[in-house]
């Protein structure tokens, strides 16, 4: 809506401890969260070196306890992009986490605090912050990451040190593939799920495709998934182009797409860079070609004018304003006055909701206890309604949250609404999570 700034701060954000009523008992064991999925230009994570300490769920710090005892206080920690080009994603997830805390405290006899730290979009910085939150702030589990490279870095360390971690908005298929971990549970859909969501529509739209993608783990796994699906359906990928991320100039890559002659272009570009690529697609006069993006984030297009946003033909989505369900949640986000509701708000909510509920079911924040209560768990919290009512469960074989996904397209400009919050896209079809998730045996995950 007007007055909501779609552009993030560029200054590093300090670590902060927030809550509607912050509990001063800082010794309580807690939860930690990172948010998101765009990239940092780095490669995949390497785990950061294990300490062998098994930090999660101490049980002696006045928070969660072992042995099935009740839990009356938790401290949630969140490492995410709070400055720089991805702050708009990280800060939305923080808002979602705060709303989840409000609901969980109202429903349960539990006090929850939230501690946030800025990843600065750097895997090493993020790992340092996550380690500090666990070892110094004594949080119970970690969640988050906008960047898939950041998420893989933290996931490796969490797996080696028995810390539960929810990579809140990271979509690289590696997180529930070769980079999966005993204590890592992905609440967002994977790239392969989103690629499958739009695969048939892409195949029906054109016989030949040119794919350009952000050159790091998120874009690499997206390109592999989309190309594989197109080729399985007998379509031709005339060429693929890895694009450095982030990049200020997409002109040369758009020129290559134009020169390819392909009637359709897959624009698998991360974060706000997609705005730059879209503007240059228009500048080069190829916006009439079929344009597809497997992972739509509404806020990226809200930074463009409506005419520019209307060029998107095919997109996949985890959730957004166009999705059925969650109307009350969407309005609560809008009432905050910070930004309109979109997928990162939901992912922040889901991560806290599922982490806290797992601790409460287990009576402990011990990583093994949380894993036991999450594996195979069928979700029955308010997030099911927010996602439109479809089945949601934590798959035991790879720790992927199986959930509905959507295909969406841009509305005609005359039908794009701005009140009570922006709705510029429309949902075309809903897919059951089991219909788009690859079989566990094909993921490369071994738990």
Set out the residue ranges of the language-model regions.
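Beta-alpha junction/loop-to-helix N-cap segments that form part of ligand/metal-binding clefts
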Residues: 89-93, 106-178, 187, 275, ...
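Extracellular/periplasmic Venus flytrap/periplasmic-binding protein
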Residues: 173-174, 181-284, 320-324
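Periplasmic-binding protein-like
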Residues: 133-146, 166-168, 210-213, 261-271, ...
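Extracytoplasmic "Venus flytrap"
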Residues: 68-96, 117-124, 146-147, 213-220, ...
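N-terminal Sec signal peptide cleavage junction
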Residues: 36-37
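N-terminal secretory signal peptides
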Residues: 1-17
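Extracellular/periplasmic periplasmic-binding protein-like sensory domains
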Residues: 281-350, 360, 431, 442-446
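Segments of small-molecule ligand-sensing domains
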Residues: 336-345, 356-420
């Amino acid at each position: 809506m007007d007055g909501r700034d779609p552009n993030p701060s560029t200054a590093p954000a300090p670590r902060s401890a927030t809550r509607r009523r912050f509990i001063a008992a800082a010794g309580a064991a807690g939860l930690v969260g990172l948010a998101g999925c765009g990239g940092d230009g780095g490669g995949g994570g390497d785990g950061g070196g294990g300490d062998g300490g098994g930090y999660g769920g101490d049980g002696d710090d006045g928070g969660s306890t072992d042995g099935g005892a009740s839990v009356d206080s938790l401290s949630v920690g969140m490492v995410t992009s709070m400055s720089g080009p991805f702050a708009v994603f990280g800060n939305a997830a923080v808002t979602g986490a705060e709303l989840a805390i409000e609901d969980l405290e109202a429903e349960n006899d539990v006090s929850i605090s939230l501690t946030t730290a800025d990843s600065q979009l750097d895997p090493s910085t993020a790992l340092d912050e996550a380690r500090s939150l666990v070892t110094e702030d004594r949080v119970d589990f970690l969640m988050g990451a906008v960047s898939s490279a950041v998420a893989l870095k933290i996931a490796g360390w969490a797996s080696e040190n028995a810390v539960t971690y929810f990579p809140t908005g990271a979509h690289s298929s590696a997180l529930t593939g070769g980079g999966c971990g005993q204590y890592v549970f992905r609440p967002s859909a994977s790239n392969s799920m989103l690629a499958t969501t739009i695969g048939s529509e892409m195949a029906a739209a054109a016989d030949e495709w040119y794919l350009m993608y952000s050159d790091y783990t998120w874009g690499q796994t997206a390109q592999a998934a989309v190309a594989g699906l197109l080729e399985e359906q007998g379509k031709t990928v005339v060429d693929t182009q890895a694009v450095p991320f982030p990049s200020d100039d997409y002109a040369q890559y758009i020129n290559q797409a134009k020169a390819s002659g392909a009637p359709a272009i897959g624009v698998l570009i991360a974060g706000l860079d997609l705005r730059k690529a879209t503007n240059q697609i228009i500048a080069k006069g190829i916006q009439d070609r079929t344009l597809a993006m497997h992972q739509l984030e509404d806020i990226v297009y809200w930074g463009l004018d409506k005419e520019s946003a209307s060029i998107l033909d095919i997109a996949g989505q985890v959730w957004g304003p166009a999705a059925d369900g969650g109307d009350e949640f969407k309005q609560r986000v809008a009432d905050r006055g910070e930004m309109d509701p979109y997928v990162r708000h939901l992912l922040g909510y889901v991560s806290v909701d599922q982490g806290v509920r797992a601790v409460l079911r287990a009576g402990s924040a011990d990583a093994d206890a949380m894993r036991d209560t999450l594996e195979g768990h069928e979700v029955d919290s308010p997030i099911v309604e927010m996602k439109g009512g479809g089945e949601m469960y934590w798959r035991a074989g790879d720790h992927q949250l199986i959930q509905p996904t959507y295909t969406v397209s841009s509305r005609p400009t005359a039908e794009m609404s701005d009140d009570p919050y922006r709705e510029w896209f429309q949902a075309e079809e809903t897919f059951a999570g089991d219909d788009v998730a690859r079989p566990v045996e094909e993921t490369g995950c071994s738990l």
